C-alpha cells in the first residue's frame, strides 16, 4: 500500500488519472463539500473512505482494512479546511502505522473553473488539456527521525512538483 498525496486544489482533475490496480481509496469528509467529491469520485470508479466528524475511529478502521487489501490511500495534506499548501493532517503517523510509502501527485489543466473557497479549488472544464505529474521519488517515512522533518520533505516535494507542472501548461 502507498499514500498518494496531492494538494487539495488539484484534487478534482486528478481523480480521472487512476485506471490501475490496486484500488485507489480517496479520503473524503462527511461535510457537504466532501459529499459532492464522493459523488464525482464514485462516478469515475473510485471507492472513497468517509471521514465522519463524529466517528473518527471508523476512518482508521477503514484505512487499516484498505491497507491490508493493498489499496492505495489518496489524501490531501492541506484539507479539509486549510490553510492552503500547509500540512494539517497526520500523514507521517498514518504512513508509519500502516508501513506505507508516500507518492506525490500533481495535476494541472489549461481550462478550469476556480471556486472562491479557502484553497481556490480548480474544477477542470470539458475539452480542456490536462497533465498529471508523479513525484520524482517514493518517500519512506521510516527514514525520518520526526514528523517535522518528514513534513518539510513532503512540502518541498509537493511544491517542486507543482512548480514543474506549471512550466508545462
Where are these regions (language model features)?
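Pre-Walker A (Motif I) flank of P-loop NTPase domains
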Residues: 1-6, 70-73
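Well-ordered alpha-helical segments embedded in enzymatic catalytic cores
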Residues: 10, 59-62
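A conditional alpha-helix N-cap/helix-loop micro-motif detector
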Residues: 53-57, 84
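Catalytic core of membrane glycerolipid acyltransferases/transacylases, capturing the structured
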Residues: 3-54, 98, 113-114
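Non-catalytic C-terminal accessory region of glycerolipid acyltransferases
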Residues: 19-22, 39, 43, 61-169
Amino acid at each position: 500500500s502507498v499514500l498518494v498525496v496531492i494538494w487539495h486544489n488539484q484534487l478534482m482533475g486528478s481523480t480521472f488519472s487512476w485506471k490501475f490496480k490496486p484500488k485507489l481509496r480517496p479520503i473524503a469528509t462527511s461535510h457537504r463539500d466532501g459529499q459532492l467529491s464522493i459523488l464525482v469520485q464514485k462516478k469515475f470508479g473510485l471507492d472513497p473512505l468517509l471521514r465522519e466528524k463524529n466517528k473518527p475511529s471508523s476512518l482508521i478502521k477503514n484505512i487499516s482494512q484498505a491497507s491490508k487489501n493493498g489499496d492505495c490511500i489518496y489524501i490531501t495534506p492541506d484539507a479539509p479546511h486549510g490553510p492552503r499548501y500547509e500540512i494539517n493532517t497526520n500523514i507521517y503517523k498514518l504512513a508509519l502505522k500502516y508501513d506505507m510509502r508516500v507518492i506525490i501527485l500533481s495535476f494541472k489543466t489549461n481550462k478550469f473553473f476556480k471556486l472562491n473557497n479557502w484553497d481556490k479549488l480548480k474544477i477542470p472544464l470539458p475539452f480542456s488539456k490536462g497533465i498529471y505529474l508523479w513525484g520524482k521519488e517514493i518517500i519512506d517515512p521510516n527514514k525520518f527521525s520526526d514528523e517535522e522533518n518528514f513534513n518539510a520533505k513532503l512540502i518541498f516535494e509537493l511544491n517542486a512538483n507543482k512548480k514543474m507542472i506549471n512550466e508545462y501548461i
